[in-house]
């Protein structure tokens, strides 16, 4: 302490001299600086040499040189002081450690004496924790019947599953000793879980997978799960099943997209993504919802280059294989993007796959353009309908139907693309893409671009054409008319043609 006091006084004197020298006409030489002495508690005299009246430049040069030398000396002294303090601290720590070992102090006591009871989640990297680990090892050697568990002490302070996350994070630390401790403790914890038959359900809840946090599938919780499941033989539900039951489809899809960006989790994320797609196919999730789940409806830039677009195209093909309902990428883009955004989608394609898809989109129209198209074709539909049907409301239904039979059609005909098509009593789904179609007593029919009349067709929908609903107990609010220009018959339906067009 006496030495530190002398050193502090010495430093203060040097700095004071430097400032005095810089603000006066004194000329300090190298010899003068070297003559600084420290006899006991007294600071040696600082001899100054005064020559004749110096010039301004000489005065500034001499002052700056003296200040630089004093600064250099001060820096060296501070460095020495820091190094000396570190050595003293290490010596005292070793002395304290030896004293505790000699007295066989209980590690639970030394844990608090080292202030580890106040430590945060980074406790595993602290020097005091490393010291305590050595104390525990020494204590356990001398007291085989009174073993102290490092893992139990950590779990007591932080919680069992919180410690599992801490250990996994510490395994990737910069300090080798910390990594070794974390690896050993993790092995002990996994063994305990296995011996206690910890269920995957309990582990899933404890690791809080269901929080839907963005980093969920790229963080340490997933790695802990994988380590435990690789150490047990279990026929329990897979990770995907837990994720699917606790996380909304759109959120889960986003998590998987993020997880695929990490080399550590890309393989698992791809596997779960495939499982999710199979689940969607089982329950026949509509392609437009999958399009949104993949976040393909929000940003037109590089849309065709994204791996999620390829996933959607693959899903659409599988969906068609199960339902025979074709929904194209062109239709999805038209539904979710305006004309100027579609231009961005086409121009921003850079990959070979994206450019290949872009070639199929030059004729894309936005939904706004399709609405205009529907408004144009709808009057033609009604003129056509009432002209060919009869001169008045008493015309027979047979005459009306016969006028539509311009081309050979049957229930096996999936699409009507031109002419007038008649479908009657059909159980299979049918599409009208460009013709004038009449659906009567059919189970399911869709009018995507033509002009259609639905008569007693229970599951009719009009996403793009000009449509009239006859004897169909629905309203526009039921989703039957979700993009086309539509009218509903009679007083049973409050929605009118004018109302639907205004909407």
Swiss-Prot record:
Keyword tags: Glycoprotein, Host Golgi apparatus, Secreted, Signal, Virulence
Extent of the signal sequence: 1-22
Localization terms from the record: Secreted; Host Golgi apparatus
Main location group: secreted
Signal among keywords: yes
Taxonomic superkingdom: Eukaryota
UniProt entry tagged with the keyword Amino-acid biosynthesis: no
Induction: Expression is up-regulated in spores.
GO cellular component annotations of the record: extracellular region; host cell Golgi apparatus
Glycosylation sites: 27, 35, 45, 108, 197, 374
Motif (dEER): 57-60
Family to which the UniProt record says this protein belongs: Belongs to the RxLR effector family.
Domain notes: Has the canonical dEER motif, but lacks translocation RxLR motif, which characterizes most oomycete effectors identified so far.
Primary role: Secreted effector that suppresses pattern-triggered immunity (PTI) in plant host.
Stated name of the protein: Secreted RxLR effector protein RXLR-C08
